[in-house]
A protein has these predicted regions:
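Condensing-enzyme catalytic core mediating Claisen C-C bond formation in acyl metabolism
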Residues: 1-28, 169, 200-264, 268, ...
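Conserved catalytic cysteine-centered active-site region
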Residues: 4-5, 56-114, 118-137, 141-148, ...
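Short acidic, glycine/serine/threonine-rich loops at helix termini
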Residues: 22-24, 64-65, 97, 122-127, ...
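Extended C-terminal subregions enriched in glycine
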Residues: 255-263, 267-292, 296, 301-304, ...
Length: 389
């Protein structure tokens, strides 16, 4: 393990228990609550925060406009900055990447990144997601997050010769993990048969293969790695591109179906962190997977196993909590997914693991290094981050 105090690091994290609804809190109260907990966890005061970034999914899910401006009164002076990052479910990791760059270049000392979703406020999430596709290349195709993931799933089945049973494997594993996580929304273990027998949302995706509608919040404080509890940010990799169901009709555009963008983002993150063999250099991985197909593609795209083998490896016991390289040891997004805060939850969970503070979800830390991922929009944005102690 390399110890440096001149790199950006995670100094503090916080999250609230994920639930379907949190009626006792308004959106600003939820943001303020989780923000101050993260600042306290970092051992700082509010006056020491000189940057604020709000990570946000579609505005329609919030019930308010321009919420980042609520933070102005809490910043210490004219030289502080605030902003909003919106790349859907990847917003949290993108915002932490931006915060790390501010800290690394000396623009800020301590940047607070915060996000929250309240499932019963704002407009219909279904309506918001239905507006994310490109009408020029997708035409009248009913493309939204669920149907796009279904197309990925059928492509995966056809490419690798596997059945829809493969998509139950991550869910069974993650629900076992989520049962140990007091912050998870869904904490009841399920069997593969229960997953496969659940209602079809868009074939082959079943209801239990999809993340629930979730209220929740998370916050992260980024600063220089100057304390024993700091978790260093070793590298980020980002890949963004134009993705469409009609991509094959547009020169230079590529299909989103094969998950190759995860490989591109991972390659950049590993290079920045000086990694060459992720299977031997990582203790665990926290991937953002609101559908089970995302977890399979992420495991393979991160170089943890060959393409088409992730489900079989899971069935054989790999990637479980207690294995050599656990994936989503806290349950992952299918056990609770506040979309705006989803990537920050992955970071908060990974930070707790590296600190040895994950309670019943704790995995063995041998190398002192982990990976977190996020996916935004209809797979237009992929983020991979390497964290270390």
């Amino acid at each position: 393990m390399r110890h440096r105090d001149d790199v950006a690091a995670i100094l503090g994290v916080a999250q609230v228990p994920m639930r379907t609804r949190i009626p006792e809190m308004t959106y600003p109260v939820l943001l303020a609550t989780v923000a101050m907990r993260a600042v306290e966890d970092a051992g700082l005061t509010r006056q020491e925060i000189d940057g604020l970034l709000l990570a946000q999914a579609p505005t329609a899910t919030l019930g308010v406009d321009e919420p980042q401006y609520w933070g102005i009164a809490g910043l210490p002076g004219a030289h502080a900055f605030l902003g909003r990052v919106h790349v859907a479910a990847a917003s949290g990791l993108s915002a932490v990447r931006l915060a790390a760059s501010y800290v690394a270049c000396g623009r800020a000392k301590h940047v607070l990144v915060v996000a929250a979703d309240l499932a019963d406020e704002g407009d219909s999430l279904r309506g918001a997601l239905a507006q994310m596709h490109d009408p020029f290349t997708s035409g009248q195709a009913p493309i939204n997050a669920i149907t796009a993931a279904a197309l990925q799933s059928t492509h995966y089945m056809a490419t690798h010769g596997v059945s829809e049973r493969s998509f139950a494997s991550p869910i069974v594993k993650n629900r076992l993990n989520g049962a140990r996580n007091p912050l998870a929304q869904l904490r009841k273990p399920v069997t593969a048969e229960e997953v496969l027998d659940s209602p079809v949302l868009s074939w082959p995706i079943k209801r239990l293969e999809s993340s629930p509608r979730t209220s929740g919040a998370a916050a992260v404080v980024v600063g220089k790695a100057n304390s024993s509890r700091a978790v260093r940010i070793e590298g980020f990799g980002n890949f963004a591109g134009a993705k469409s169901i009609g991509a094959q009709m547009v020169p230079g555009w590529t299909s989103y179906l094969d998950g190759s963008d995860v490989k591109q983002a991972a390659r950049r993150a590993y290079s920045a962190a000086g990694m060459t063999n992720p299977q031997q250099e990582l203790d665990f991985v926290e991937v953002y997977a609101s559908f089970s197909i995302f977890e399979l593609l992420s495991i393979e795209g991160l170089g943890l196993c060959p393409a088409g083998e992730a489900a079989r490896r899971i069935n054989e016991g790999e990637f479980h909590r207690g294995s050599a390289l656990p994936v989503n040891a806290t349950g992952g997004a299918t056990c609770g997914n506040p979309i705006s805060a989803g990537a920050l939850v992955r970071i908060a969970d990974a930070t707790a693991q590296l600190r040895g503070e994950a309670g019943d979800c704790q995995v063995e830390i041998r190398h002192g290094r982990a990976v977190v991922t996020a996916i935004g929009g209809l797979f237009q944005t992929h983020e991979v981050g390497v964290l270390a102690i």
